[in-house]
């Protein structure tokens, strides 16, 4: 979950794709190769696991956010599922990892009030705008790492993405009777894949 007005754009707040050990080191992941951790950002690192090891790892995130602007202050506390993954050896030179993790999160509710002026009569009317959104994208991946030479491994991840992002925009005139209100809702349903 998230409470950020910046998630109004694009896919929302992109999730950190690194796992526990990498996050503890500031998000570094591409150069890490360790047989005791899962590193989906470097699928070649899967081959570091030994034949007697099976890794099952999960994570959650806690977030405390302070937002201020225009004299308004907001404190938001969020918790969310981070990832669930496993890694194991298939062959002395081949290892595999499978996992589920969020790709992006959308969550916002922003309102403001403006004044509109009729250019013909000069009459004014207040109107309010509300922007809300929720949802996000999820990622399921399966990756293979192959040890080609003693000091050379290659790897690939195949990922499937799915999810919905709902956005609503409402404009209404609370002080004008008989005024037409504007309501627009968009739902983006995503179903796609990638190789990396």
Where do the language-model regions lie?
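Subset of outer-membrane beta-barrel
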Residues: 1-196
């Amino acid at each position: 979950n998230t409470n950020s007005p910046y998630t109004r754009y694009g896919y929302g707040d992109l999730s950190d794709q690194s796992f526990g050990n990498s996050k503890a080191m500031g998000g570094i992941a591409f150069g890490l190769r360790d047989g005791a951790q899962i590193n989906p950002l470097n699928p070649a690192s899967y081959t570091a696991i030994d034949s007697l090891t099976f890794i099952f790892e999960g994570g959650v995130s806690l977030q405390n956010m302070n937002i201020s602007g225009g004299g308004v202050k907001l404190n938001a506390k969020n918790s969310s599922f981070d990832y669930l993954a496993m890694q194991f050896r298939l062959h002395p030179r081949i290892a595999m990892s499978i996992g589920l993790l969020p790709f992006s999160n959308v969550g916002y509710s922003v309102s403001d009030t403006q004044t509109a002026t009729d250019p013909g009569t000069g009459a004014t009317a207040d109107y309010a705008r509300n922007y809300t959104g929720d949802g996000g994208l999820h990622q399921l991946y399966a990756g293979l790492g192959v040890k080609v030479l003693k000091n050379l491994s290659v790897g690939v991840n195949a990922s499937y993405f799915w999810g919905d992002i709902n956005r609503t925009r409402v404009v209404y005139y609370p002080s004008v009777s008989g005024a037409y209100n504007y309501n627009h809702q968009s739902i983006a349903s995503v179903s796609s894949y990638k190789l990396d």
